[in-house]
Amino acid sequence: MNNELKLGKRQKQILDFIKQSCKEKGYPPSVREIGQAVGLKSSSTVHTHLVRLEEKGLIRRDPAKPRAIIPLDDEPLLQSEALSVPVIGNVAAGSPILAEQNIDNYLSIPVDFLGSGNHFILKVKGDSMIEAGILDGDYLIVREQADASNGEIVVALLDNEATVKRFYRRDDYVELRPENALMDPITVNNVQVAGKVAGLLRRI
């Protein structure tokens, strides 16, 4: 792009690092990673440079999402091949499940594998869903949504822990049913549904 010729040294370093990260990892770097790569300690200074790059039409940002910094030269490639989906680790008390402090990593998932909506990935811990074919260590692709229909497999938050169960709403309580004959259902008055399981990834 012609606008790249008008960049200062620091902005060019930042743009090159964003492109390199997208190419090598399949997802953009965080603001903190950009600062570390180019020697800037202040996140606000990095943000200022990102605003300038966006004004020059060299990147596209979504301030509501972490790591949503896409170099426009690479945007068609990223959109047509894969999307960067956050992998959720431990859920911090009181925070939305996609808050940056809950995100351990990102995985590139082919767009054809994802439907509509926002998604996250959760690594399965335990064997409560083995009879549904969901094993310990599997990675679940989860569509973010706040409710579910009876019988759907959901990720629910209980005491700030993410659990995977079948969802059933009864008259005055919610039943979270495991797919393991050795385990009992969990009943609660109400529950926060983080999303519906939409797919599964497994390493062999």
UniProtKB/Swiss-Prot annotation:
Molecular functions per Gene Ontology: DNA binding; serine-type endopeptidase activity
Keyword set, alphabetical order: Autocatalytic cleavage, DNA damage, DNA repair, DNA replication, DNA-binding, Hydrolase, Repressor, SOS response, Transcription, Transcription regulation
One protein family per Pfam: Peptidase_S24
Residues at the catalytic site: S128, K165
GO biological process: DNA repair; DNA replication; negative regulation of DNA-templated transcription; proteolysis; SOS response
Reactions accelerated catalytically: Hydrolysis of Ala-|-Gly bond in repressor LexA
EC nos: 3.4.21.88
Site feature: Cleavage: A93, G94
CDD domains: HTH_ARSR (cd00090), S24_LexA-like (cd06529)
DNA-binding feature ranges: 31-51
Family: Belongs to the peptidase S24 family.
HAMAP family: LexA (MF_00015)
Oligomeric form and interacting partners: Homodimer.
Main function: Represses a number of genes involved in the response to DNA damage (SOS response), including recA and lexA. In the presence of single-stranded DNA, RecA interacts with LexA causing an autocatalytic cleavage which disrupts the DNA-binding part of LexA, leading to derepression of the SOS regulon and eventually DNA repair.
Protein name: LexA repressor
Lineage: Bacteria, Bacillati, Bacillota, Clostridia, Eubacteriales
Gene: lexA
